A protein has these predicted regions:
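Extracellular glycan-recognition regions
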Residues: 1-219
Length: 219
């Protein structure tokens, strides 16, 4: 019979551990924060999804913003350079970000995603000079634990015209009772409005870190 309680003794009883999931306003740091987290300007909860190209990304601590450049054409968000990610938490996870897409060009995308092989995303883009908010996803090809084989195309579920280049985007993920679903919302007319459908998430070996929330920009 398994024990209900197991006592362990820490080898570092005075150590302070920072959370794996937390908010960040990317604002100016004091010397103690810089000592703890390094010099680039992020808390330790953030991780790059790929090997970064640091000349294409800037943390403007004075303005409290993260500035990304779209200098590489990508097939979809999984190829985006400099995507930064955090873990998601059980049983539910809610994340918000404000995207300022004033400098976006036709064909660029900037926003937030639930990053895995069968990803879901909401992003600001521009088409023929018109600013749009879109919700896109990549659906499961098969029920194997192996990842998609690249035979499916990304689906754009909804696109809405937006007047302002500054848009609040919200991600809500539900992991309770193996629901494993995510939806995206945007702030308009003093309320949150859903864009696109709930998207089904899957754990597969192509992204063995599970599902992470990501901030991205790509062309």
């Amino acid at each position: 019979r398994a024990l209900c309680e197991v006592e362990t003794q820490s080898t570092r009883p005075d150590a302070q551990y920072h959370p794996l999931v937390e908010s960040d306003d990317f604002s100016e740091w004091n010397p103690e924060q810089k000592r703890l987290f390094g010099t680039f300007g992020w808390k330790s909860c953030w991780q790059f999804n790929h090997e970064p190209e640091l000349s294409w990304i800037e943390n403007d601590a004075e303005k409290g913003c993260l500035r990304m450049s779209c200098k590489k054409q990508c097939k979809n968000v999984t190829q985006a350079v400099n995507t930064i990610t955090q873990r998601m938490k059980f049983p539910m996870c809610i994340t918000e970000v404000t995207v300022d897409a004033e400098g976006i060009k036709d064909g660029d995308y900037a926003g937030m995603c639930a990053l895995q092989g069968c990803y879901g995303m909401a992003a600001v883009t521009k088409r023929d000079g018109q600013m749009l908010l879109v919700m896109r996803s990549l659906e499961e090809e098969h029920d194997s634990i192996e990842g998609n084989q690249g035979n499916s195309e990304e689906i754009e579920w909804e696109a809405v015209s937006v007047e302002s280049s500054r848009i609040r985007i919200r991600l809500e993920a539900d992991f309770q009772n193996q629901h494993d679903k995510v939806r995206f919302l945007y702030w308009s007319d003093e309320k949150w409005k859903q864009i696109g459908p709930w998207h089904q998430l899957y754990f597969k070996m192509d992204h063995f870190t599970g599902c992470r929330v990501g901030l991205f920009a790509y062309a």
